[in-house]
């Protein structure tokens, strides 16, 4: 039977399935980490030593006292940092007085004389101390400590101050305590007099007084002068006359606060222990026309 054309199948009327293309699973992408390497800044321990690194990450290669990051540091010759301890610090021969706790940053003391553990220093504007130098009547050795130039005398004066002065006392109080101690614990003994206007006798007189506990006005004046200097005062002795131009006498003068004041421990001693009269006060006496609290002093230049 013939079928109509519309119902007849064509020879190639097979459905051909489209080719199945498999897409490969995408592999994860390899990402490179872009985290920044920390930049060294400030105080950095590079193994066994400490250095200072600037904000640019470079090591600071300067020497001496430097202001870095708003603080002060001392950089040695090899650029390592000096670690400070409280008090004196020898930084490659220069002594600095550190006012803070231990650490690498430096805290200076106020400029001026400074007593630490029985030693006297003079702090300069940059925090270092005077070394192998003098300021007026005060001489400082290589280690920055005040010295009379005689080790035996220095030790004797420090021992006297240790016995006379209370530890917590101010410098002004210690001066008075030393003065009173000399007046009350040493005795008068007639000894050699020295020419008016000379001062080179002070060391010998002070040493003799410390050794024997006895001496004349030159001994009183010399020993108190060295005590005052050990406390940081600009003190000196005068050989002149008292009461009249023929009465040899010696006393101590101290320059302070724009004035020059007179100290005469031996005259006080005489009124208390020799004359047995009412005590006089010759501690820090101001003068006018040679008169000091009722007593006439004749200076060599007059």
Task: Describe these PLM feature segments.
Residues 274-302:
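Low-complexity, Gly/Ser/Thr/Pro-rich intrinsically disordered linker/tail segments
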Residues 1-3, 162, 214:
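Mature extracytoplasmic/luminal segments of secretory-pathway proteins
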Residues 152-209:
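Secondary-structure boundary elements
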Residues 174-178, 213-228:
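Active-site nucleophilic cysteine motif
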Residues 1-6, 185-186, 197-199, 228:
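Terminal non-domain segments
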Residues 219-282:
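Hydrophobic/aromatic-rich core segments of domains that either
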Residues 3-156, 194-195, 238-248, 252-253, ...:
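Extracellular adhesion/carbohydrate-binding repeat motifs centered on closely spaced tryptophans
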């Amino acid at each position: 039977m013939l079928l109509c054309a519309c119902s007849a199948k064509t020879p190639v009327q097979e459905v051909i399935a489209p080719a199945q293309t498999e897409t490969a699973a995408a592999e994860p992408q390899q990402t490179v980490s872009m985290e920044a390497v920390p930049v060294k800044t400030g105080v950095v321990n590079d193994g066994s030593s400490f250095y200072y690194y600037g904000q640019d990450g470079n090591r600071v290669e300067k020497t001496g006292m430097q202001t870095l990051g708003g603080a002060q540091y001392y950089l040695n010759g090899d650029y390592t940092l000096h670690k400070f301890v409280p008090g004196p610090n020898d930084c490659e021969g220069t002594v600095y007085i550190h006012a803070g706790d231990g650490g690498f940053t430096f805290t200076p003391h106020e400029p001026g004389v400074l007593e630490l553990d029985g030693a006297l220093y003079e702090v300069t504007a940059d925090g270092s101390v005077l070394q192998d130098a003098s300021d007026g009547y005060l001489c400082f050795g290589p280690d920055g400590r005040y010295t009379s130039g005689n080790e035996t005398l220095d030790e004797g004066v420090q021992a006297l101050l240790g016995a006379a002065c209370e530890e917590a006392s101010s410098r002004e109080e210690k001066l008075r305590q030393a003065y009173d101690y000399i007046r009350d614990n040493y005795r008068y003994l007639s000894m050699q007099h020295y020419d008016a206007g000379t001062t080179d006798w002070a060391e010998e007189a002070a040493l003799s007084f410390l050794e024997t506990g006895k001496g004349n006005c030159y001994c009183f004046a010399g020993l108190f002068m060295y005590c005052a200097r050990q406390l940081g005062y600009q003190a000196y002795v005068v050989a002149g006359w008292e009461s009249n131009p023929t009465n040899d006498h010696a006393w101590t003068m101290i320059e302070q606060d724009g004035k020059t004041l007179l100290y005469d421990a031996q005259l006080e001693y005489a009124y208390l222990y020799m004359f047995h009269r009412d005590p006089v006060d010759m501690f820090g006496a101001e003068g006018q026309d040679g008169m000091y609290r009722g007593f006439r002093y004749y200076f060599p230049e007059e």
